[in-house]
Amino acid sequence: MKTLLLTLVVVTIVCLDLGYTLKCNQLIPPFYKACAAGKNLCYKMFMVAAPKVPVKRGCIDVCPKSSLLVKYVCCNTDRCS
């Protein structure tokens, strides 16, 4: 009985992910990574000349400003980039 209770507690902790971390897509979207502490935004960077093709994706703490050549899109939910 104690073993069953302990198993349920462990499963609950794993499922709830008590130390929540943001998950951001990598360059190829089916793959993602958990962000480090303090990195609370996902970002997608692409060239303005080719807006449909992302150049880089990942985790970041502050969304960079876009320029004439490069555009950044940031969001704060799991796998949103």
Curated annotation (Swiss-Prot):
Q: Which GO terms describe its cellular component?
A: extracellular region; membrane; other organism cell membrane
Secretion signal span: 1-21
Compartments, record wording: Secreted; Target cell membrane
**Tissue specificity remark:** Expressed by the venom gland.
- The keyword Membrane is assigned to this record: yes
Q: In this UniProt entry, which cysteines form S-S bonds?
A: 24-42, 35-59, 63-74, 75-80
UniProt keyword terms in alphabetical order: Cardiotoxin, Cytolysis, Disulfide bond, Membrane, Secreted, Signal, Target cell membrane, Target membrane, Toxin
SUPFAM superfamilies xref list: Snake toxin-like
A molecular function (GO) held by this record is: toxin activity
> What CDD domains does the annotation carry?
TFP_snake_toxin
Source organism's superkingdom? Eukaryota
Q: Name one GO biological process term.
A: killing of cells of another organism
Q: Which InterPro entries match?
A: Cytotoxin_Cobra (IPR003572), Snake_3FTx (IPR003571), Snake_toxin-like_sf (IPR045860), Snake_toxin_con_site (IPR018354), Toxin_cobra-type (IPR054131)
By sequence similarity, the record places it as follows:
Belongs to the three-finger toxin family. Short-chain subfamily. Type IA cytotoxin sub-subfamily.
What role is this protein assigned? Shows cytolytic activity on many different cells by forming pore in lipid membranes. In vivo, increases heart rate or kills the animal by cardiac arrest. In addition, it binds to heparin with high affinity, interacts with Kv channel-interacting protein 1 (KCNIP1) in a calcium-independent manner, and binds to integrin alpha-V/beta-3 (ITGAV/ITGB3) with moderate affinity.
Listed under subunit, the entry gives: Monomer in solution; Homodimer and oligomer in the presence of negatively charged lipids forming a pore with a size ranging between 20 and 30 Angstroms.
Q: What is this protein called?
A: Cytotoxin 8
Q: Identify the taxonomic lineage of the organism of origin.
A: Eukaryota, Metazoa, Chordata, Craniata, Vertebrata
